[in-house]
Amino acid sequence: MKKKIVTLGLMMVLSMTAVAGCGQKAGVETTAQAAAESTAADTTAADAAADTTQADAAGTETTAAAQSDDSYQYVSAGDAVAAAKDKSAHVLDVREWDNYVKGRVADSMWCPIFPLEDDSLAEAMGTYAKENLSDGQKIYIICNSGKRGAEKATGVLKEAGIDGSLIYTVEGGAKALESEKGALTTNRADEDIDWKTVAAADALKAVGGSDIQILDVRDNDTYAKGHLKGSIQSSLKEIEDPAAQTAMYKMAKEEMDPSKPVYLLCYSGNKCAKTGISVMKDAGFDVDNLFIIENGAKDKDIQAAFVTE
């Protein structure tokens, strides 16, 4: 009997030990599982954080690209032509003369930025902007294709103090304008300029003096048959001819003084003289200092004063 009791007790002890061992094992497994789940959660959080960071970075890159695209504003060729006509914006052509003279928007302004490597042109444009473009109106820039020239001009205008929100590029530049019917012209006689005149009698009083310049824009043969003493001549008989306008422009730049008044003589005091004034405006002359002799060479007193030397 005693032996059975001892045996039974021993079996109970062994059983309890086994239970305890199983409990410890379960505890270890539970702890390991919890740790694994915690690690997985941490990994998920890290992945989420990484995704968020990547998304933020992508968003920043997208924003930067958008800002880069938005740094230049655009206007259509048709709107630029309309703006020049109704004076709702300054339409500024920045092409070099040889391209500009072959076709320009009527009533546009001209201040070249080409060749782009010529720093003196940027300086001149900065001065021009301060004197002519600082009135708060929008500015529409025309270059060859709506890219490099307009981009450089935009930078120059901003450096000159022009608000960037007022500066627009004509999309496609002169190439787009060529596709717009009637957008480009070589006719300058219909410009919206405040044409000024001088009476024939007053012009004759100034002949031979050093205070004014007399510019005869009649053709070579007509000029040779009779002209005012001391005058200089550049034919604009073919008023829409780019070559004639170029010759006039070069003479104005090289032989004439922009600080002195100019009296222009043409056949009748109309289109040829007006063309000359428009060209001289591009050459840097103040239109308030340019005068058309009334009635031109049709005036009998003017004819009587002609010389042939």
Predicted regions span which residues?
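Bacterial N-terminal signal peptides
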Residues: 9-17
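Rhodanese-like catalytic fold shared by cysteine-dependent sulfurtransferases
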Residues: 4-8, 20-36, 55-77, 81-86, ...
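Coiled-coil-like amphipathic alpha-helices with heptad-repeat character
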Residues: 17-20, 92
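Structural scaffold elements adjacent to functional motifs in cytosolic proteins
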Residues: 91-93, 214-216
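Long, intrinsically disordered low-complexity tandem-repeat regions enriched in serine/threonine/proline
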Residues: 39-55, 63
